[in-house]
Amino acid sequence: MGLTIGVDIGGTKIAAGVVDEEGNILSTHKVPTPTTPEAIVDAIASAVEGARVGHEIVAVGIGAAGYVNRQRSTVYFAPNIDWRQEPLKEKVEARVGLPVVVENDANAAAWGEYKFGGGKGHRNVICITLGTGLGGGIIIGNKLRRGHFGVAAEFGHIRMVPDGLLCGCGSQGCWEQYASGRALVRYAKQRANATPERAEVLLALGDGTPDGIEGKHISVAARQGCPVAVDSYRELARWAGAGLADLASLFDPSAFIVGGGLSDEGDLVLDPIRKSYKRWLVGGNWRPVADVIAAQLGNKAGLVGAADLAREPDPIM
């Protein structure tokens, strides 16, 4: 079909990239993310125009955080942008003069990993992103499954603990409250408060107090064998693996692809997740067990996936 542009709307920058049919990024253009909804639309158009210079572009795919309708045109609701029933497709098309599709950013990243990253060779995969929160995407039979209204795969808000921790969504006990970057930092702070003698390495990396602990400190301390840091990763993995076991019962994929910032830690995170997953998988000793694979595209997955989805007339069900 030719070259397409993928757009990734980040908290601080909007990135647009020209992507070929093999998932290669040929050029990129980045602009700062504005603070107002209409200015963000203008910034998306600016990023697209900057990236398309010198290329013949056939379509644009935009990855947006929030709920996107099944027609891939309107953002129902975006938690960090004041978009409510935002006709994003229509507005961007009017500015850039190209066909535009809009996709949930986690779905776009999942598609990118499935098509060009860790999911290559699989027909049925579940992707989860372990970052500040927890997101994901469902690919079954080589199709991205979005549900009847287009808002499936909000895995982070599956209720794991009835009457559990309060979530930013307004519910309680959501999975991302127990398996995410925020959860990891909370575990480390709690453990450092309770047993500071087991957190000396970790505390020394910050300001010397539990409140000063950051995610980057936990990674460094864990690799140095700090007991509190290692235990914090194990607790995160316990919840992540338990959730994967539930998803296996629902979807029976051949593989789980784990992406997001926490996946950059490699086997420090993935090995205990695999162990927890097998521990909680019903009939795990007697049935085939899906692989748990690290994502390969890093922060490029959303841009590449959005660009590729723009080529498809309707790949989503």
UniProtKB/Swiss-Prot annotation:
Self-association state and partner proteins as the record states: Homooligomer (possibly a homotetramer). Alternatively, it may form a heterotetramer of two glucokinase subunits with two ORF2 (AC P40182) proteins.
Kinase found in the keyword field: yes
Homology family: Belongs to the ROK (NagC/XylR) family.
Top-rank taxon: Bacteria
Native organism: Streptomyces coelicolor (strain ATCC BAA-471 / A3(2) / M145)
CDD domains referenced in this protein's UniProt entry, alphabetically: ASKHA_NBD_ROK_SgGLK-like
Its EC number(s): 2.7.1.2
Entry protein name: Glucokinase
